[in-house]
Amino acid sequence: MKKLLTLTTGLVAIVLAGMIGVPAQAYEAGPVTGGGTIDGKVVFNDAVPTRKIIPNKDVEVCGGIREEPLIAVGPDKGVQNAVVYLVEVAKGKAWPAAGKTPELDNRKCRFEPEVQVIRAGPLDVVNDDPILHNTHGYYGKRTAFNMALPNQGQRIPTELTRVGTVRIDCDAHGWMEGWIYVVDNPYYAITGADGKFSITDVPPGSYTLVAIQSFTGPIQQPVTVTAGKPTNLTIELKKQ
């Protein structure tokens, strides 16, 4: 069954709360019997807006004046780096195998990765550049962390323990921008260059699915997963 989702203005309270950070909910990992898959594509059908970046310092590292899109859209309208996730999932598949601590890297006056999803917990902030960066994360208007990194190769650990959207700025380079989405369950995906995503091993049942991109903001939609079957979605983002 294929559904077309469009942006709504009456977003559920949990989505709005997630923008400012809420405590992580308990999640029980275990075997999933008869899990289904949510396969989909995120699209943007309007004209792609851009912003003009004018570096006013450290141009030898940061580069020159340039135009950059506010949303990455491919020739078939697929949106890259949109985040899709399920909310209020109390039980299901295991988290991905633990590796190194997630990183937010200041590299050539950009945040790498620009968009990432992490489990509530530790984060390392890194400076790869030979210049000062001041990396500042916000849940809404509330500071999540604020750290000066004057030295190349510097690494500072921090914790993001609340679920929600964290906007990342650099107080030394005002055009830098990144996004971290902190989640409390492993049912999430980031769209590829073609706008497609897949969320696997979802226990049968009804859920709220959220898709979000920094320019358009979030969209939420009920979704029902049937045992052993795929649910196919096309999600259309629009500027709020």
List the predicted regions and their residue ranges.
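Positively charged n-region of N-terminal signal peptides that target proteins for export
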Residues: M1-L4
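Hydrophobic alpha-helical segments and their boundary regions
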Residues: T6-G10, A29
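Bacterial N-terminal signal peptides
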Residues: T9-M19
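N-terminal signal peptide c-region/cleavage motif recognized by signal peptidases
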Residues: G21-P23
